[in-house]
């Protein structure tokens, strides 16, 4: 039974991630993210639709029901709070944080979650700059939602810009090779870099080191101009 619950939570969290990244949630995208077969994904989505968690639209995109979205937000909140704990207090290697938090999100109790909100210094964003959602649901008031910047692939084409890295979405954290390249170049949340959005790729330069991201990963980088991005 627990395996079924975990599978449901993983699917809902993946749909939530895709929405955050500006990607249409399709069963094919879930199959890619979770490395599962098409038939397996279709069967699981059909079960989730029967359970009232998602709805398959005529264009085949997946829409979470209010119940499904509430569960997705709860799972993502626990995931990102776990990331903060693992980084800020335990001091786990940043390259291991995402995978470890994926385990914690399914077993963290509501009591522990509320306690984390009390002991952590920053519960607005994960260590990767991603907003921690649904804090009001556990009694934490926020004046406003944190800004999320703009996707690197949505920057003007061919123009060199000075920007600050504000967010690295989940798909980039999972790609250990590319994430390590960024880390080795000193590119992390809060780093100021020079960036050019070219056709099909984004080039980021920091301290003389140049990192190239193709669009399938560059969409997961969000930035803001050092002097503000409109």
Swiss-Prot record:
It is found in: Cytoplasm. Iron-binding repressor of the dipheteria toxin gene expression. May serve as a global regulator of gene expression. Represses ripA under iron excess. The lineage of its organism: Bacteria, Bacillati, Actinomycetota, Actinomycetes, Mycobacteriales. Residues 4-65 form the HTH dtxR-type domain. Its main location: cytoplasm. Homodimer. PANTHER family: IRON (METAL) DEPENDENT REPRESSOR, DTXR FAMILY, IRON-DEPENDENT REPRESSOR IDER. The gene is dtxR. This is Diphtheria toxin repressor. It holds the Pfam family Fe_dep_repress. GO terms for biological process: negative regulation of DNA-templated transcription. Keywords: Cytoplasm, DNA-binding, Iron, Repressor, Transcription, Transcription regulation. SUPFAM superfamilies: C-terminal domain of transcriptional repressors, Iron-dependent repressor protein, dimerization domain, Winged helix' DNA-binding domain. GO terms for cellular component: cytoplasm.
